[in-house]
Amino acid sequence: MAASKDGCGVGEVAAGNGRRLHLGIPEAVFVEDVDSFMKQPGNETADIVLKKLDEQYQKYKFMELNLAQKKRRLKGQIPEIKQTLEILKYKQKKKESTSSLETRFLLADNLYCKASVPPTDKVCLWLGANVMLEYDIDEAQALLEKNLLTATKNLDSLEEDLDFLRDQFTTTEVNMARVYNWDVKRRNKDDSTKNKA
């Protein structure tokens, strides 16, 4: 099987070479010389090597599925955070006002309720896991801006990891094709020597 180098975590840089490691995704090493590669211990037959490469390919597919799910979740969170920040900025402007704010809020799909919100300098934010906390508007805005920055960085990191993973797919597929072609040539060569004998 192609050699692999394991990374440690998000945003870490490999010692010495200055490259970012990708979520512990093992790097597929391109097989330059198939003959010498097939002579390595554990690479007795092309079938064994192809099976190992296919297992590695399936692992990459599984990793891609997980990263794609994380990406979808982040792409859904970022607009929600931005919308909440816009609402907080509006509340910040209206904080000194004495009149109450008339609004409609979503109860369920296509079902809204009308509400009158008195002037306040406090807001409640859903933190997840059925937890809601009350914050000052400034604290809530700082928290949401930090969360938006983190979510954006994570999304960028996921994009890089998915690109890296696509490169590993390609390398593994090319390695599989090279080993398969090597085996076909070897068998044709064996058949031609048997026919001559």
From Swiss-Prot:
Sequence positions bearing N-acetylalanine: 2
Instruction: Identify the main location.
Output: cytoplasm
Record keywords: Acetylation, Chaperone, Cytoplasm, Nucleus
Any idea which GO molecular function terms this record carries? tubulin binding
An example Pfam family from this entry, by short name, is Prefoldin
From the Swiss-Prot or TrEMBL record, state where the protein is found: Cytoplasm; Nucleus
For this record, the Gene Ontology CC terms, alphabetical, are: cytoplasm; cytosol; nucleus; prefoldin complex
Reply yes or no: does the keyword Nucleus apply.
yes
What are the N6-acetyllysine sites (modified residues) in this protein?
Answer: 59
Q: Which terms does the UniProt entry file under GO BP?
A: microtubule-based process; protein folding; tubulin complex assembly
Superkingdom as given in the UniProt entry: Eukaryota
Reply yes or no: does the keyword Chaperone apply: yes
Q: How does it assemble?
A: Heterohexamer of two PFD-alpha type and four PFD-beta type subunits. Binds to the C-terminal part of VHL.
Record PANTHER family: PREFOLDIN SUBUNIT 3
State the function annotated in the UniProt record: Binds specifically to cytosolic chaperonin (c-CPN) and transfers target proteins to it. Binds to nascent polypeptide chain and promotes folding in an environment in which there are many competing pathways for nonnative proteins.
As for family, the record states: Belongs to the prefoldin subunit alpha family.
Q: What is this protein called?
A: Prefoldin subunit 3
What is the species listed in this Swiss-Prot or TrEMBL entry? Bos taurus (Bovine)
